[in-house]
Swiss-Prot record:
InterPro entries: BlueCu_1, BlueCu_1_BS, Copper_blue_Plastocyanin, Cupredoxin, Plastocyanin. Its main location: plastid. Residues 1-98 form the Plastocyanin-like domain. Cu cation binds at H38, C83, H86, M91. It comes from the Eukaryota. Belongs to the plastocyanin family. PANTHER family: PLASTOCYANIN MAJOR ISOFORM, CHLOROPLASTIC-RELATED (PTHR34192:SF10). The gene is PETE. GO terms for molecular function: copper ion binding; electron transporter, transferring electrons from cytochrome b6/f complex of photosystem II activity. Participates in electron transfer between P700 and the cytochrome b6-f complex in photosystem I. This is Plastocyanin.
Length: 98
């Protein structure tokens, strides 16, 4: 499984790493690393055709350190992801599914 931290160890508002490649159906575990409220929103304009961005997003906030969300993406392509409250600060990432 791939692991993505929400918030850097240094307190930065970032997905760490901010670019990953996974196999179709591989688990991606998002972990709140900072204790700030973060969420995982798939950009409806930046997912493969036919993918329901709302269905794979986790819009409810992960409020506490250590909270996790797991997603499995089965459609190959590139996915743009952002944290809604912190996207203005550049908290975005790209997931490539092969």
């Amino acid at each position: 499984a791939a692991i993505v931290k929400l918030g850097g160890d240094d307190g930065s508002l970032a997905f760490v790493p901010n670019n990953i490649t996974v196999g179709a159906g591989e688990s991606i575990e998002f972990i709140n690393n900072a204790g700030f409220p973060h969420n995982i929103v798939f950009d409806e304009d930046a997912v493969p055709a036919g993918v329901d961005a709302d269905a794979i997003s986790a819009e409810d906030y992960l409020n506490s350190k250590g909270q996790t969300v797991v997603r499995k993406l089965t459609t190959p392509g590139t996915y743009g992801v952002y944290c809604d409250p912190h996207s203005g600060a550049g908290m975005k990432m790209t997931i490539t599914v092969q």
